Each structure stands twice: as structure tokens, then as C-alpha cells.
A protein has these predicted regions:
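Eukaryotic calmodulin/EF-hand partner-binding IQ helices, IQ-like basic amphipathic helices, and related
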Residues: 41, 99, 103, 118-122
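Weak global preference for isoleucine
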Residues: 7, 23, 73, 80, ...
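Amphipathic protein-protein interaction modules
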Residues: 68-115
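Polybasic, proline/glycine-rich intrinsically disordered low-complexity segments
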Residues: 106-141
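Short, surface-exposed, charge-dense and proline/glycine-enriched linear segments
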Residues: 52-64, 80-91, 117-130
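Conserved short "hinge" loops at termini or chain/domain junctions
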Residues: 1-66, 128-143
Length: 143
């Protein structure tokens, strides 16, 4: 069995978010619940996984022993889910502020574009890792 923490800890080595740190300090259970939500998003995206990704949400673990590469891929999908959430939050804040200054608007647009570029690069990284993962077991596929 692979614990959720193993995947989330790997993902958190990439993410530096003061809000997550503060949530962890204030309420570890809420922190875990938030992280588990992002992990469920990651599980839904990892459709190519050769193992069953069934899990026990109470025990916070997968039923299977996931490989190092499977853990890595899920952690990167977790990071993508986090980035998408951050990007959506930033876009919503900008809309609510209704900033009239062209400089600020352009800066916000550039910031949004950069965040989108990061997400695109993460997706490319996950795609490469997934292709490597599938090639490891190429003999199992019927041609």
C-alpha cells in the first residue's frame, strides 16, 4: 500500500505556498483534506496507470504498492492541479479588483500567461514521464 503522504510529500518539494504552510500550522487535518482533494484530481488524470488506483480515503492510502515512477507521475499531476487552482484564484482576484490601470492589467495578464506556461511545461514533463512509464511495459501490449 502506498500512502497519500508519500505522493503529497513529493509534490510539496516542488510547491512553495505560504497559504499551505499556514493551513498546516493551523489545522493539519484540513491541510491533509485539501492535499487529498488535489490528489484525487491527480488520480483522475492518470488514466494510463497500469495498476488499479483504488484507494481507502479513511486510511489515506492506495490499495496497491505504487512504483517510484507512478508516485512521481501522480505527484506531478498534483502539482498541476495546485497550479491550476492558483491560476484560477489569481484570475478571479484580478476580475474582482477590476483594475483600470493598463500597466497593472498588462502585468496581471503577463503573470497569468507565465503561470499558464508553467502549467504547460509541467504537462509536457508528465507526458514524457508517462510515455517512459508505458514503454517500461511495452511487451504487455498486444499489437
Amino acid at each position: 500500500m502506498t500512502s497519500f503522504d508519500k505522493i503529497e510529500d513529493l509534490a510539496l518539494t516542488v510547491v512553495s505556498d505560504y497559504k499551505l504552510g499556514k493551513l498546516f500550522e493551523q489545522d493539519e487535518e484540513k491541510f491533509k483534506k485539501f492535499c487529498d482533494g488535489l490528489l484525487m484530481n491527480a488520480v483522475a488524470q492518470f488514466t494510463e496507470c497500469r495498476q488499479d488506483l483504488a484507494y481507502d480515503d479513511v486510511a489515506r492510502s492506495f490499495d496497491a504498492d505504487l512504483s517510484v515512477l507512478e508516485v512521481y507521475i501522480l505527484s506531478r499531476y498534483w502539482v498541476i492541479a495546485w497550479w491550476e487552482r492558483e491560476t484560477n484564484n489569481a484570475a478571479q482576484i484580478a476580475l474582482k479588483l477590476k483594475v483600470s490601470s493598463a500597466f497593472t492589467f498588462n502585468s496581471e495578464a503577463q503573470n497569468f500567461k507565465e503561470k499558464q506556461n508553467i502549467i504547460d511545461k509541467l504537462r509536457e514533463e508528465v507526458d514524457r514521464a508517462t510515455q517512459d512509464y508505458l514503454l517500461l511495459d511495452i511487451a504487455a501490449y498486444e499489437f
